Amino acid sequence: MKAIMVLFYVMTLTIIGSFSMVSGSPGQNDYVNPKLQFACDLLQKAKERQ
């Protein structure tokens, strides 16, 4: 059950990350929404745990 929740969580963050890529390049931090940046940071932490 926990694995399913983690998988769903990572998929959601991946989708959010793809939208942030469309709105602006990753290097332009001024245009990144703080919530999207927070989600990307969580996604990086999730990848490190695996």
Swiss-Prot record:
Domain of life: Eukaryota
Organ and tissue specificity: Expressed in venom sac and, to a lesser extent, in venom gland. Not expressed in brain.
N-terminal signal peptide: 1-26
This protein's record includes keyword Transmembrane helix: no
A single cellular component GO annotation: extracellular region
Keywords, ordered alphabetically: Disulfide bond, Secreted, Signal
Keyword Disulfide bond: yes
Subcellular location: Secreted
Protein function: Amphipathic peptide which probably adopts an alpha-helical structure. Has no antimicrobial activity against E.coli DH5alpha or B.thuringiensis. Is not cytotoxic in vitro.
Binding partners and assembly: Dimer; disulfide-linked.
Name this protein carries in UniProt: Ampulexin 2
